[in-house]
Amino acid sequence: MARTAPAASFESLESDLDQKFAYPASSKTYITGSRPDIRVPLRTILQTATRTEKGEMANPPIPVYDTSGPYSDPDVHIDLKAGLPPVRAKWIEERNDTEVLTGLSSEYGLARANDPATAHLRFAQLTNPRRAKAGANVSQMHYARKGIITPEMEYVALRESLNLQALYDKPEYKALLRQHPGNALGAALPLRPEDMTPEFVRREVAAGRAIIPANINHTELEPMAIGRNFRVKINGNLGNSAVTSSLAEEVEKMVWSIRWGADTIMDLSTGKHIHETREWILRNSPVPIGTVPIYQALDKTGGIAEDLTWEMFRDTLIEQAEQGVDYFTIHAGVLLRYVPMTADRVTGIVSRGGSIMAKWCLAHHKENFLYTHFDEICEIMKAYDVSFSLGDGLRPGCIADSNDDAQFGELRTLGELTAKAWEHDVQVMIEGPGHVPLQRIQANMDEELKHCYEAPFYTLGPLVTDIAPGYDHITSGIGAANIGWMGTAMLCYVTPKEHLGLPDKEDVREGIITYKIAAHAADLAKGWPGAQLRDNALSKARFEFRWEDQFNLGLDPERARSFHDATLPAEGAKIAHFCSMCGPKFCSMKITQEVRDYAASLPEAERGMQEKSIEFVKTGSKIYS
């Protein structure tokens, strides 16, 4: 899937997916749960054999977490106009606490459905939405607190563990599964893969330390968890604007993002046909989709924040919930009394949602209607199992503004709202900054854990310096790795175009890979069981000059291969025992292998003297220390 030009149509995108999506040297495999319809996907990276003087030694396949859905399964034909298979439909029906509505409940949704001008844009295979039966609560938190382990929870447990426990008794994995002890900084990670059980997942969701964003109307979803005691996740953003783009382009952006490893997607569309764009994305997305409903509500007013009303916003929530949106960013913590605190900031209020609500509060001199109507919002959320992503509308937009009274005042209000949402058994995560220098990051994590009761933290970076426009995927990736280690559950990616323009596909790829690195570095630091397996496999391949395995085990095989081939394009270079950096005579790994081979050929006594000789040279060739 190397094409960078946007798809002109769904037909051309489907053709591209069928031909180019497959990962190199990989197979799509599934773990089956307690019932045959719990089929958890993972990717298995196949390795070549190690060549020795005694012959070839096989290297085992490496299982990795996979977010690509059916798009990477060669046995599945992708039909974007039909959408993905409804893998959760039966689970939801069996619970018998929802009902299929006779039609849409949202006034705006009905208007769009009945507008002849939008007929050519609509997803054709729509079914009527579901909603909780009267008096029912259908959230994963509600089930967890009742002691019920849902298929979604079992799915998550299998997905997080990758069934790695089955590898520990296999001799070919013994060296590869070695791992440095981590420092979880207070998190209660599973100690071994087998400790990641459905019951573990249930307890974490019941306590509010994790969420499973899974709207009952997003049946195509492959369930995943966001929580401090799970793998660190990343989010990718997409969305049209007033100047871009087609429906096919937006679906392509979603598929492109999950191909590189996005665990969730936020649709931040602000242009034309927001409703129809979101429908196409949801019906074809295997990962949770989040939105910022205030953006669409503002669009309905013609962009005039003062004209927003609770009734209009409520209708937007229902419209999006009935489409299947899994989590909403709600800026309910932007209170009237906090707005003046931003007056002396260098960059003021940088959140779009935060600035919209601040303007509304000042124009009406009233409290934020998202705050005053919060209980009513909770009633909507639990009827569809939409999770809260409580927005940080007052996040700092530069490091000079970090950790100020406005930011932390809002955070404490988000903690108050978290407790209120939990009274309704509604799932919650907390959004965080932003721009924070390294030495001030820990305070953000500490404040969130204390005041938001360990609800999952979801941060945008943070960027640790403001001097690098064009490289803010790096400035933020540094902060993301640190705050991920400290306990942040999900990292929102930043692309090289941050603060400069709308990212294209290559910018999205760059941002996602940067954040996959940050998330993985955090998992290693925390000591996630089995996290070092892929590192060890790649290191072994590097030492043995198995170039193809090095490429394929990496996060971006295409880039690794292209960099290597830029200077050594011949096929023979793929088995050469050197690269273009050192050349054949100065490769440290080749020299080390020669030393090992030489030492192995010596008699034992002589070998010992040879080892001492090498040790003497390595320590500086000094007789006296």
From Swiss-Prot:
The gene is thiC. It catalyses: 5-amino-1-(5-phospho-beta-D-ribosyl)imidazole + S-adenosyl-L-methionine = 4-amino-2-methyl-5-(phosphooxymethyl)pyrimidine + CO + 5'-deoxyadenosine + formate + L-methionine + 3 H(+). Pfam families: ThiC-associated, ThiC_Rad_SAM. One of its GO terms (biological process) is thiamine biosynthetic process. Substrate binds at N237, M266, Y295, H331, S351, R352, G353, D392, G393, L394, R395, E431, Y458. Zn(2+) binds at H435, H499. One of its GO terms (molecular function) is carbon-carbon lyase activity. The lineage of its organism: Bacteria, Pseudomonadati, Pseudomonadota, Betaproteobacteria, Burkholderiales. Its cofactor is [4Fe-4S] cluster. Belongs to the ThiC family. InterPro entries: ThiC, ThiC-associated_dom, ThiC/Bza_core_dom, ThiC/BzaA/B. This is Phosphomethylpyrimidine synthase. The keyword Metal-binding applies.
